[in-house]
């Protein structure tokens, strides 16, 4: 009986761990989304393009497999690995 109980506990722990998914905030509404498998990094990128003085900066949030590259028109780039950390 103890063996059966121990087996059930181990199976439950393994299943709970396998079912974990990352959530990140996603533009345009900054609502949490479940990231696709393999995309375990949340990012927040703020960039300024040609019409930035008129329209303001472009904000992009989402999931990624790797941290996006910092480009010349980017003002800031945040990459993090905890749920909804890209705010």
Swiss-Prot record:
Disulfide bonds: 24-42, 35-63, 48-52, 67-79, 80-85
Protein location: Secreted
GO cellular component terms, A-Z: extracellular region
Tissues expressing the protein: Expressed by the venom gland.
Transmembrane feature ranges: none
Main localization (coarse): secreted
Annotated signal peptide: 1-21
GO molecular function: acetylcholine receptor inhibitor activity; ion channel regulator activity; toxin activity
Entry keyword set: Acetylcholine receptor inhibiting toxin, Disulfide bond, Ion channel impairing toxin, Neurotoxin, Postsynaptic neurotoxin, Secreted, Signal, Toxin
Protein role: Postsynaptic neurotoxin that binds and inhibits neuronal nicotinic acetylcholine receptors (nAChR) with high affinity (IC(50)<100 nM). Is a selective, and slowly reversible antagonist of alpha-3/CHRNA3-containing and some alpha-4/CHRNA4-containing AChRs.
Family: Belongs to the three-finger toxin family. Long-chain subfamily. Kappa-neurotoxin sub-subfamily.
Subunit (UniProt): Homodimer and heterodimer with kappa 3-bungarotoxin; non-covalently linked.
Protein name (Swiss-Prot/TrEMBL): Kappa-2-bungarotoxin
Organism expressing this protein natively: Bungarus multicinctus
């Amino acid at each position: 009986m103890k063996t059966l109980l121990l087996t059930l506990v181990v199976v439950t722990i393994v299943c709970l761990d396998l079912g974990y998914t990352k959530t990140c905030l996603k533009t345009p509404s900054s609502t949490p989304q479940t990231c696709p498998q393999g995309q375990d990094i949340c990012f927040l990128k703020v960039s300024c393009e040609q019409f930035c003085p008129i329209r303001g900066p472009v904000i992009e949030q989402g999931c990624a497999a790797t941290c996006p590259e910092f480009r010349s028109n980017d003002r800031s780039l945040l990459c993090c690995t905890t749920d909804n950390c890209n705010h």
